[in-house]
Amino acid sequence: MSNNVVTELAPTGTLRAAINLANFLLVSSRADNGDPQGVAPDLAAAIADSLGVGVSYVPFERPGPLADAAVEGVWDIGLIAVEPARAEHIEFTEPYVEIEATYLVSGHSDIQTIAEVDQPGVRIAIAARSAYDLYLSRNLQHAELVRAEGIDGSFDLFVSEGLDVLAGLRPRLLADVAQIENCLLYTSPSPRDRG
């Protein structure tokens, strides 16, 4: 590894890796010392090892604050989803993993396909500033996004407000569908799983 690459990626001599703690698929637990554990921390440690430097984890409760901190110089690499809005201040590599996001639709809704979600009057619970929030903000034309803090917050909002749709990571929605009577978990283009 050239010294220029090491200096560019780890200017302090330690690779400071920003970790999004909200993504339970990439951060599964905490070590006894408090360090995050899972795919994202392991990847950061492997990158640091290949650079010949140590790793220091810079945890963030959600992806939005992690992205905001890009301009503050508190981390060297961040492990969050590629998103055009974030690319204004973050230079992304090719994705290292793909995680499907989809919809959980309330049983009281007449929605039968993903294409039917984007219509006037449809209210979608969503984790604020998640990659899928940013994507849907750019692409939906009629449905209303109702934001909550984090994945748990969006689930609670969906249930408490009786919203039509919950947008989220498919693996989490698979667990959520089991907790709510008469909901549909969608994949493109039609319903797939009923809870």
Kindly give the residue locations of the regions a language model identified:
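Flexible hinge/capping segments at coil-to-helix
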Residues: Y96, V105-R123
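Extracytoplasmic small-molecule ligand-binding "clamshell" domains
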Residues: N3-A81, R86-E88
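A ligand-binding cleft/hinge motif common to bilobed small-molecule-binding domains
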Residues: G64, A81-H89, V159-L185
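Ligand-binding cleft/hinge of the Venus flytrap
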Residues: V27-D32, A44-G54, R129-G150, A178
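Short loop->beta-strand "edge-of-pocket" segments that line small-molecule binding or catalytic clefts
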Residues: T14-L21, Q37, A115-Y132
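Conserved small/polar residues in nucleotide/adenosyl-binding loops
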Residues: Y186-D193
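Hydrophobic residues within well-ordered alpha-helices
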Residues: I47, A69-V71, V117, L157-S160
